[in-house]
Amino acid sequence: MIISVFTEKYKSIQRKLINSAVVESNGNTVQAIAQWDTGATGTCISKKIVSQLGLQPTGMIRVQTPSGIGIMNKYMINLILNNEVRIMNLVVMDSKIGNQGIDVLIGMDIISIGDFAVSNFEGRTQFSFRIPSQGHVEYHR
């Protein structure tokens, strides 16, 4: 079994979990900034990424966001996180997330295929992600 893992470390407490990513499609790649969001059920990409890769929709999907219900385009991509974790044939939707300065919003569709842990020990945030899941994380006194 191949285990893919990375840990992102910050020098201070972070309220946004950000890391580098590469979006691939049809042999083309784009460097991207990804933000992790446990409140998002699905992964989204910015309209800028759609344009840069010349992506064509594979269909439409009805989604509910904090700002309402909408219909969005679906796309098929490969996603590489921190040059370590590769997720192939990922169905994503486009979104206006580029307004937030990010290119990819990582949702629970990705988080749920592995183990995801966040720590803020000694005033420094770090988070780790690995696939496939290797076990539960439990905290004890």
Specify the residue positions occupied by each region the protein language model found:
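Pepsin/retropepsin-fold aspartyl endopeptidases
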Residues: 1-141
